[in-house]
Amino acid sequence: MLDIIELKDNYIKFSISGITPAIANSIRRTLINDIPKLAIENVVFHHGEIRDSEGNVYDSSLPLFDEVVALRLGLIPLKTDLKMNFRDQCSCNGEGCDLCTVKYSINKLGPADVFSSDLIPINNPDLKPVDPMIPIVKLKKGQAMLVTCEAIMGRGKDHAKWQVTSGVSYKYHREFKINKNELENWSFYKDKCPKSVISENENEITFTDDVECRYLQQLFDEKSGVTITEDDTKFIFQFETDGSLTAIETLDYALKRLKERFNNLMESLSE
């Protein structure tokens, strides 16, 4: 069973019960390596003179190597549509169409700082950079930047630029059972961590650190009156995304992807 503990656009914390450590690690690896994401793969730089509408001439040579700029462009998180095809699986046979490729352009005249907001989607205006203020390069007077880019779908196992998540971690569900008769200051923990209380009776009170409370860490130092147990069939996960997908979209896809891979494995074993 899956329960969401905390949810934001780009962050989620949830619990899953009734699974083994091997399954938990499979979920973690899927979240890191196997989520589709849109990222810039091809960059074409215009080299030579550029003229503005008033006839002023600019030099399109950049202060950084083209390879460095291309790498920076590839690492800019882009809004992602999971309905897009992978280029090698598209009906266009890898030529690049609107179903598998998003084209972008940058046309900037110096002196100016070039930011990710200058990366303009051409054929799909909704798939813009997540953060408009990521710096790319600084142009001096008389310099210009004119590039066209192609973004395609990929997975984190192929390159870090296609990795949606960061900080993917999990731990066992843990409970701290306090004997009220043996630990005099038990009420201190109840006052400081009210959301962590999961049960209470006349003689005992039980906390969990599924909902984090820094004061619970002090219970590890108590000499008596505290029993700490871990459940190796229930896990607490948390991760955040770079904004290309929401956290709930990422989790939903990961679970479906894992189920699909298990089904494919079972089919291959039965043949």
From Swiss-Prot:
It is found in: Cytoplasm. Keywords: Cytoplasm, DNA-directed RNA polymerase, Nucleotidyltransferase, Transcription, Transferase. GO terms for molecular function: DNA binding; DNA-directed RNA polymerase activity; protein dimerization activity. Its EC number is 2.7.7.6. It catalyses: RNA(n) + a ribonucleoside 5'-triphosphate = RNA(n+1) + diphosphate. It comes from the Archaea. GO terms for cellular component: cytoplasm; DNA-directed RNA polymerase complex. SUPFAM superfamilies: Insert subdomain of RNA polymerase alpha subunit, RBP11-like subunits of RNA polymerase. It is an enzyme of class 2 (transferase). InterPro entries: DNA-dir_RNA_pol_insert, DNA-dir_RNA_pol_RpoA/D/Rpb3, RBP11-like, RNAP_Rpo3/Rpb3/RPAC1, RNApol_insert_sf, Rpo3/RPB3_RNA_Pol_subunit. One of its GO terms (biological process) is DNA-templated transcription. Part of the RNA polymerase complex. Belongs to the archaeal Rpo3/eukaryotic RPB3 RNA polymerase subunit family. HAMAP family: RNApol_arch_Rpo3. DNA-dependent RNA polymerase (RNAP) catalyzes the transcription of DNA into RNA using the four ribonucleoside triphosphates as substrates. This is DNA-directed RNA polymerase subunit Rpo3. It comes from Picrophilus torridus (strain ATCC 700027 / DSM 9790 / JCM 10055 / NBRC 100828 / KAW 2/3).
